[in-house]
Every structure is written in structure tokens, then in C-alpha cells.
Amino acid sequence: MHATVKGPLADTVAGATAEAVLRACVHCGMCNAVCPTFQLTGDELDGPRGRIYLMKAALEGEAIGRESQLHLDRCLGCRACESACPSGVEYHRLLDIGRPFVDEHVRRPWRERLTRWAIRWVSTDPSRFRLASALGRAVRPLLPASLRGKLPSPSRGGVGGGRLPAESADGRIPTAGAPSQAPSTPYPLPSAGRGMSLLAGCVQAAAAPQFNAAAARVLARVGVELTETPGAGCCGAVSFHLDAVDEARTLARRNIDAWLAEADAGADAVVITASGCAAFIKDYPDLFAADPAYADKARRIAAMVRDPVEVLEAHPPVAARPPAEPRIAVHEPCTQRHGLKLPGRVGALLARLGFEPQPVRDPHLCCGSAGPYSLTQPTFAAALRANKITALTEHAPAVILTANIGCWMHLAQTSPVPVRHWIEAVDEVT
């Protein structure tokens, strides 16, 4: 596809990136076959090919309207199209340029602006998320369903109800408190050469601290010590996907500086239990491509990112007991399957530990969570969740295991079976 970016992005790093992505597209339309929103509406403009045309027109200087913004807003950013594309079109890189560009030229209604600001304000800081959750519980009956279901509730598997064990003065996460069904298999004590940083996160730190606690216990048993890095916090993904790019960069710089200090002190990697955060941090080099002070730093951090399954493949755990509920359905978040490109890896690890992963129809399709998407596009998100839960529960699993905080909260809202993080299941059998 011929493309020449004009206007403010002409002759910029972002403009050159957009042109390269556009030129790789050959209009074949194979992307539409795997696009969740195209499957819902059948509208060409709600599929990747149509959205590519919209962004191309905008970047080449054609008039931009509210309709273009709406169709881009409906994109989940799931990247299923990238996994299916025979030409290797990196659609998300174009979306990350085109969507903020359109947002700068089309003013949103005030209600949308307020909603998007509120989501960013609440979700990027654990203390604010806890405060908002407490206030929300007080007025739960008055809230719309899309918000009511996100509130922490002990009945949803302890969402927001847990607390991370107290940290030591140096930020080390205690590994005490492992499931007490049986003594754990002994492993070598962590050594200084196998220390890794752990992202505490923002929403997850408030709503599901048990995920990181489980990861710390599991990895300690295979000789890897995790330390939550002082100074690191929200990865910036929510801000970025709500087109607050400068805010996202501010959050990312803080993390980069904190993790580089840890790396210089000997940390081997940055372990991230939320696949959405991991995928975004992997894209830090794009975020800082035009920033000479942080471009190399961002590349260094991106190369250090590890999903827990990658660490456990290198340091395999040993089952100490059979699973209490072996029949499981593994939900692979889009950020893990398409973003981190780790399809099938969690299921394979769990199978080696005695679990019985059941087949899941259309595993490439998004559940509808997609970061803030379930709040900004609740109708689409609810339809996609209903389809995903049907697929996940077709073979009667006892539990659904996922790998991302947003997907966990979104699925648990209506799932007929418990939804947990897969690392918790590993914790219980090792």
C-alpha cells in the first residue's frame, strides 16, 4: 500500500514507522477473519483493513471526523490480526500512532473526556484504586453494570480481598504462606546470581496482590528470588491506550530508571505476572523511539521482560502433590498469545504438573477486557466476554486460569466457574 505521511508527522520517527507499516499491507483482508469486532458487526471499518484505511487517510492529511474516531475506539488492540497476517503487518504500531493522532484532531464530548480521565486517575495508582473501590462499594446499587462488576468482592475469588505479605526493608517478598496441603518440594535457596525484579503494578497491586505473592513462592522453590522494585509502578499502558501519551511516558521513565538501577545491582530480568503490562513494556522502545535520552534504556528494559512461564521453562518446577482440581480451561490473554507470542506455553507447563487443560474453541479471540476497553466500550466488551466464557466452559472445567489482571476481573464478573491466575495453580502443586 503506497503511503506518504503529511502534516505534523511528516519526516518524523512516528511518520516513518507509520509509512513502513502501511506499505507492508497488501489489502488481502485475512485480518478481518480473526478480528473480534469485525465478527460482531460485519462492518469493514470495524476490522483491521478498514481501520488501516482510516488511519492512512488521516495521516495523509485528509479530513478526520468523529466516525473515524469511533471505529478506532472500537479496536481492542488485541493483535490477532498480526498473528494471522501473511505479510507481517505490525498493525499495533500503526494504531499506536494513528489513534492518538486522530484524538488530537477530533475533540471528544465532555462526558467521554471525563470518563477517560477518571479511568486513568483511578487505575494508575493502587491507593487511588483502593479508595475508588471503597467508595464504589458504598454506592454499588447506583452504578452502571459495567462498573458494578469491577468492584472488589470476596465472592469473586478474593478480588481485592487479599494482601501481599509484608515486605522486608529491602523490598524482598516473603515466601512464607505457601499452601499448607503438604510440605513443598525442597529447592536450592535463591542465589545472588538468580535475582529478578518483579513489577508490583497498579490495579493488580490493589485488587489481586496474591498473584505476585504466589509467583514469589513458586520461583523461590526453583531458586529464583523476586524483589519488588522501589520506585517502579504503573507501566503506563492504560494512559497510553486512552491516548494520554505524555502521561504514559512519564510513568515509563520512572520504571526504566528504577529497573536499570536494579539491573546494575545484579537483577537478571523483570518478571511480570500481568501479561498486559509485559506486552506494553516490551513496546517501550517504540514509546521512546524519538527520545535520545531513553531510547537505548527502553530497549535494554524491554529485553529484560519475562513472563513467569518463561522463567519456569528455564527453571522447571516439580509437582509435590496432584492438583485438587485437575480439569482446567486455560485462557490465553491476547497480550500473552499475540503480544508476547507465547501461545500454548502455560497450558503445556500446567499439563506437565498434572493438570488437564481442556480444549478451548477460538483461543485467538479476545475476551473483551483489553485494558480500559471494557469500561469505554461496555456493549462490545460484554458480547465478547459472553462468547469467550461459552468457549472456555464448553468442556466443563473446574476452574478457568488466565494470565492478566484485566482479563481476570472481566471474566470473573460473569463466569459460572472460578477464575484464577495460573501461577496460583502452580503454587498449589509445587
Predicted regions and their residues:
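Cysteine-centered iron-sulfur cluster-binding motifs in ferredoxin-type domains/subunits
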Residues: 19-38, 65-89, 364
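Alpha-helix capping and helix-loop boundary segments enriched in small/acidic/polar residues
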Residues: 23, 42-46, 239-246
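Non-heme iron-sulfur electron-transfer modules
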Residues: 1-11, 38-70, 88-117, 420-425
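Generic N-terminal leader/targeting and pre-domain segments
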Residues: 1-31
